Amino acid sequence: MREKHYSEDNSRKRKRGELEHNSDLNETVLPSDWTPDPVKNFAADDDDEETKAKDATMVLPFVKKSPVWKIYESMEVFKRVPQSPHFSPLFEAKEDFREGFALGMMVTFSGVLEKVEDLKTDVPIRQLNSLKDSFTELEKHGFTVTAPLSRIAKLLALKDRQLKILEELKVFDKEMKDESSKKHKAEQEFGEMERKILEVKNKVLELQKQEAALEKQKDATYEKICKMESRARDLGVELEDVE
């Protein structure tokens, strides 16, 4: 019975020690003057209770120590587009680098968002894909990127349509050139044919003239023969009279 009591007493001491140890760990990881969410000021005043509860329980992979956070939190872009990134992928990074990486991503988000807002329809596809990759990476760290990705997707779709139209125009232009070449060739052949027809017409006209001349010559010869025959008959009559 004494051994059982001793064992239970030791068990209670171990549990109490574990709780105290865990309490010390919690104080080390989450000091009393540290807010779990390093970007809590990014949330809009009208955030719903669910978002507030989520932010309150968020545990980041680093302690917000840099005074630069206040500068970033007061930037217009984060007031206009509130953000609550969790930076959970940074748990895989070296601890000393985590906060710096997070600050870098804050700057990156501000920069790429500004670029997206200033995009024109003539933006190169390469730039759109680069921005898309940047926002996709930021999304992994908890940034809300639905709006910029949607704009990029629309511009990419527009670019895709433009490329298709350009391809269609290229095909159409080639077909137009082919048809124009055929038309030019047909015009040349038609011109050659007209020239030959004109030559034939001129030849026919010449032959018709020759025919008319021969017809006239034939008639003149016939008339002459008739006159000669008539004269021969007259001479025959005169000869008979003389006899």
Swiss-Prot record:
This is DUF724 domain-containing protein 5. Its main location: nucleus. Keywords: Coiled coil, Growth regulation, Nucleus, Transport. Residues 59-243 form the DUF724 domain. InterPro entries: DUF724. Signal peptide: none annotated. It is found in: Nucleus. May be involved in the polar growth of plant cells via transportation of RNAs. The keyword Transport applies. Residues 174-223 form a coiled coil. Residues 1-51 are annotated as: Disordered. Pfam families: DUF724.
